[in-house]
């Protein structure tokens, strides 16, 4: 599944709602606010699922 920049996603195992900010070396770069500051991490796209209310690239 491909994600678009600005799409909301979460990790399959659960976690915060994150925003896709880009792609690098086959990884999906995400950012989220944890209550103290903005966090950033890269995930393999198979680890992520669309967030509530977001649309995947196939639906656009």
Curated annotation (Swiss-Prot):
Highest taxon in the source lineage: Bacteria
What is the name of this protein? Uncharacterized protein YodC
Q: Which InterPro entries match?
A: DUF2158
Q: Which organism is it from?
A: Escherichia coli (strain K12)
């Amino acid at each position: 599944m491909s994600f678009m920049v600005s799409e909301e996603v979460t990790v399959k195992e659960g976690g915060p709602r994150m925003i896709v900010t880009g792609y690098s070396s086959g990884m999906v770069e995400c950012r989220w606010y944890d209550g103290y500051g903005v966090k950033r991490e890269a995930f393999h796209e198979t680890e992520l699922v669309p967030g509530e209310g977001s649309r995947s690239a196939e639906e656009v």
